UniProtKB/Swiss-Prot annotation:
Binding site for pyridoxal 5'-phosphate: 106-107, 179, 205-208, 236-239
Modified residues (N6-(pyridoxal phosphate)lysine): 239
Keywords: Biotin biosynthesis, Pyridoxal phosphate, Transferase
Similarity-based family: Belongs to the class-II pyridoxal-phosphate-dependent aminotransferase family. BioF subfamily.
Name of protein: Putative 8-amino-7-oxononanoate synthase
Biological processes per GO annotation: biotin biosynthetic process
Any Pfam family the entry gives: Aminotran_1_2
Sites where the protein binds substrate: 18, 131, 352
Species lineage: Bacteria, Pseudomonadati, Pseudomonadota, Betaproteobacteria, Neisseriales
Keyword Transferase in record: yes
Amino acid sequence: MKVFKQQLEQLGAQNQYRSIPDLIHQGRYITRENRKMLNMSSNDYLGLASDENLRRSFLQQYGGNFPSFTSSSSRLLTGNFPIYTDLEELVAQRFQRESALLFNSGYHANLGILPALTTTKSLILADKFVHASMIDGIRLSRCAFFRYRHNDYEHLKNLLEKNVGKFDRTFIVTESVFSMDGDVADLKQLVQLKKQFPNTYLYVDEAHAIGVYGQNGLGIAERDNLIAEIDLLVGTFGKALASVGAYAVCNQVLKECLINQMRPLIFSTALPPFNVAWTYFIFERLPQFSKERSHLEQLSAFLRREVAHRTQIMPSQTCIVPYILGGNEATLAKAEYLQRQGYYCLPIRPSTVPKNTSRIRLSLTADMTTDEVRQFAACL
């Protein structure tokens, strides 16, 4: 045990030690250590997680005859239920694509997709700032990979040109909305690049965009009218949609490859049908939340301006607003100060973000009021 204790002590000395907090949730507020705070760190972007009317409508819809609370098995064995197919068909229909496939989480999706669709003769080109789950999936793929500079498409093009004809297939991998900086990939440029090179596929993670952007809440790909051009469009139900699980939208051939070769799908007990039914209920209503999306954008634009006055770096274009302070100690101190003022703000440190870019990741939700965000900005 000595070596493990030393590792923990080293993390503590670097202000990188983590622990799981004890929290009580009350709508958009969180209570921690008897301190009630406005939650400025949530991914509940549309504010649906605590919407009692939605919850009541969902429960009344089933009248006590609820779907099973467990699947008890992988979908490929005895764990498949009609509600899974219903949701996949709904997702595919809304995206106007051939097929969709459900996963237990965004992490499961990103961990398993690339290993299932690549060989040792393949190439992966990933944005430098893609999520840790995508990096883990890339590592498990056991194929060649390079990380192009963040949103630097000249660098990406250079890598594509250097590797023409060397691999059986190439995957370009990116997020649409980046989870730590809140900036947005140029999907149009990525689609254009993909088309210039043979056997090249585009894989976009919309975890922080689904529900929030696009006329129907289908993400940046919908906003930019590019859904049909993206080979693998992945998103999560656990953020703006206030549920659990994830999906991939793709063609039928890729779906069947994933069903046959994706280990996290094949060897995991499927999500409880009850949760999938709740996801269906929310996803079906996604186009109806345009007022929430509009209000969230107004709040986000205001907070981005306020934070930009106080930091040298403001990459955000979304409701994820990084307040970059640099060092771990300063970031921890600022987070503690804001919590004392009644705002649940959390420090983000390396290795989650690059060294010397420690920050408070501010995340807005549509159930916040304009006055609440103004008062928070004054505390900064």
